[in-house]
Amino acid sequence: MKLYSFQEHLLEFKIRLLRIFTAFIIIFAICYYFSDYIYSFLLEPLAKLSGDTVRNIIYTGLTEAFFTYIKLSAFTAFTIIIPIIALECYLFISPGLYRHEKKIIAFILFMSPILFWCGSIFVFYFVMPKAWNFFLSFEKRDMIVPIILEARISEYLNLVIHLIIAFGIAFQLPIVIIVLNILKIVKTQTLKKKRRIAVVINFIIAGILTPPDILSQFALAIPLLLLYETSIIICNFIETPRTLNVKYQMD
């Protein structure tokens, strides 16, 4: 463990922050240049469900489209530089950590971006098509005055970002559980006994983070339960050597 003065810590923090900011600006500029393609990609779930139906995405404010593309570029840039942020955070705090603490932090910062991306991929390819199909079922084209969807460009992006962030954060569940187990705050046996409570909590979280339709809630709750069970298996592997070591010392 290395000891630094406050000024050295502050200088190091500024350098790390500057690197993150520089990376963000560069990636943001690239994303803004390709923002049309990125937005078209996000529209794919809706476009595939529409088939031959002509679908319009509108904007009702003069600056709405511009600021929507700015928001899209910023969000895309942030999701891309998550590993850079994680690396810079690790390099900043690692000199002040013990070896076992470094392993825990490295595990968290390595797995967190991966799980976030897994959640994003899952929601985009599996949840959004089902959710969009549900919402499109409210269209009534055969009525005297047809009811059709003409989504606003900003509202559509806000919903997509909301879902990606919700699933990305929810997929961090294994990290939280495993770290608590490593710190000996939560035991595997406790996780097994509290399964029913975990099921209820997962559905509550899903209800808060997802749109109000039941399909989206189940689409998040079920993966969370699978992640919970996976966490139990991993925690069991972590605890087994620890238990054997205690028994060996007692003998």
Curated annotation (Swiss-Prot):
One of its GO terms (cellular component) is TAT protein transport complex. GO terms for biological process: intracellular protein transmembrane transport; protein transport by the Tat complex. Coiled coil: none annotated. The chain crosses the membrane at residues 23-43, 73-93, 104-124, 159-179, 197-217, 218-238. It comes from the Bacteria. Pfam families: TatC. Keywords: Cell inner membrane, Cell membrane, Membrane, Protein transport, Translocation, Transmembrane, Transmembrane helix, Transport. It is a multi-pass membrane protein. It is found in: Cell inner membrane. GO terms for molecular function: proton motive force dependent protein transmembrane transporter activity. Belongs to the TatC family. The Tat system comprises two distinct complexes: a TatABC complex, containing multiple copies of TatA, TatB and TatC subunits, and a separate TatA complex, containing only TatA subunits. Substrates initially bind to the TatABC complex, which probably triggers association of the separate TatA complex to form the active translocon. PANTHER family: SEC-INDEPENDENT PROTEIN TRANSLOCASE PROTEIN TATC, SEC-INDEPENDENT PROTEIN TRANSLOCASE PROTEIN TATC, CHLOROPLASTIC-RELATED. Part of the twin-arginine translocation (Tat) system that transports large folded proteins containing a characteristic twin-arginine motif in their signal peptide across membranes. Together with TatB, TatC is part of a receptor directly interacting with Tat signal peptides. This is Sec-independent protein translocase protein TatC. It comes from Rickettsia prowazekii (strain Madrid E). The lineage of its organism: Bacteria, Pseudomonadati, Pseudomonadota, Alphaproteobacteria, Rickettsiales. The gene is tatC.
